[in-house]
């Protein structure tokens, strides 16, 4: 059951833009394709409700997540230095045209 292994959210940003948020897969379930399935289902739902574009915000260094986003067709559109949770990081914006 996917809901016990991970989670993802699709948030409305505007009438035409949805935001992928909060992708999480339990450590014991990583590497089983669950993250890819969650991202794919989220993109499918965005298309179903009529969004024309999706965005997501993340930080550099989350390579497993980045590979999932790239495989689904997201492209990196912006990077900028930031500071959160007591650490410096490189904030990233990714976008997908639907």
Could you describe each region identified by the protein language model?
Residues 32, 36, 40:
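Residues forming the Rossmann-fold NAD(P)(H) cofactor-binding site
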Residues 26-28, 32, 60-61:
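Active-site acidic-Proline motif in GNAT/NAT acetyltransferases
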Residues 16, 32, 48-52:
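Short coil/turn segments at alpha/beta junctions that flank glycine-rich nucleotide-binding fingerprints
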Residues 52-98:
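C-terminal "cap" of GNAT-fold acetyltransferases
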Residues 1-27, 39-41, 45, 78-82, ...:
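Acetyl-CoA-dependent GNAT
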Residues 39, 45-58:
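Conserved GNAT acetyl-CoA-binding A-motif
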Residues 31, 44-48, 75:
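Conserved amphipathic alpha-helical interaction elements at protein-protein interfaces in regulatory
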């Amino acid at each position: 059951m996917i809901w016990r292994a991970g989670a993802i959210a699709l948030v409305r940003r505007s009438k035409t833009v949805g935001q992928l948020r909060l992708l999480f897969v339990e450590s014991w379930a990583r590497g089983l394709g669950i993250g890819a399935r969650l991202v794919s289902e989220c993109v499918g739902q965005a298309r179903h409700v009529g969004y024309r574009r999706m965005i997501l915000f993340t930080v550099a260094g989350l390579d497993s997540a980045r590979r999932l986003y790239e495989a689904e067709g997201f492209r990196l559109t912006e990077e900028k230095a930031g500071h959160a949770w007591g650490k410096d990081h490189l904030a990233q914006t990714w976008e997908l045209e639907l």
